[in-house]
A protein has these predicted regions:
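Catalytic-core region of carbohydrate-active enzymes that cleave or remodel glycosidic bonds
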Residues: 36-39, 43-46, 65-68, 75-189
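N-terminal catalytic cores of secreted or lumenal carbohydrate-active enzymes
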Residues: 1-41, 45, 49-64, 70
Length: 190
């Protein structure tokens, strides 16, 4: 199939994600089976596991303990959209992570302001500064945090699912948000 679509050689695939915001017994069962199959055929590929939906609480704690106990060689995908100062207050989140456990991929993150839906709360400068502050914590903990990606990226004006996005567009224009410039700042200078 790959060759038929114009790419004869295998891709240099380094990561494969198994799950998206999953946790619990069904995920554990399915993950174990898929992890085993991937590692038997492609031992060099790093498997990305799921931390679940939240940054804290019983489901998160249980998932992380299970991953650290059985799958330390994975990279754990964490997702979070936070409100009003959370990223400022948790800039040190990864300072206390176990260095011998699974590494982290912050696969989705964004700061969001209260009052979602107003023009003032859509991708504003306060959120961008908060995200920049948080990224300094991710960089400081580069021995644990392997990757991070802002989400979501694109939004069509009046047809979006989220009110925080890096790039807004309509049929006439494109707007790059303050959060976009934070991502560019870090991508080009860190």
């Amino acid at each position: 199939l790959r060759a038929a679509n114009g790419h004869a050689k295998p891709f240099n695939l380094q990561y494969i994600g198994l799950g998206n915001e999953n946790w619990g017994a069904v995920y554990e069962r399915n993950f174990k089976a898929l992890y085993k199959a991937v590692k038997e055929k492609y031992p060099q590929i790093t498997v990305i596991s799921s931390a679940g939906t939240y940054l804290e609480g019983d489901a998160y704690d249980g998932n992380m303990a299970w991953i650290d106990r059985e799958f330390k060689d994975t990279v754990v995908d964490e997702h979070y959209y936070t409100y009003d100062g959370y990223l400022f207050d948790h800039n040190d989140r990864y300072d206390r992570f176990d260095r011998s456990g699974a590494h982290v991929f912050v696969g989705e993150y964004a700061a969001t302001s209260a009052g979602i839906g107003t023009i003032e709360t859509k991708s504003n400068i306060w959120e961008a500064v908060e995200e920049a502050s948080y990224l300094t914590g991710l960089e400081r903990n580069g021995d644990v945090v392997d990757m991070a990606s802002y989400a979501p990226t694109f939004a069509k004006v009046n047809a979006q699912s989220w009110n925080v996005n890096l790039i807004w567009f309509d049929s006439r224009q494109t707007v790059l948000t303050p959060s976009y410039y934070v991502q560019m700042l870090f991508a080009n200078n860190v």
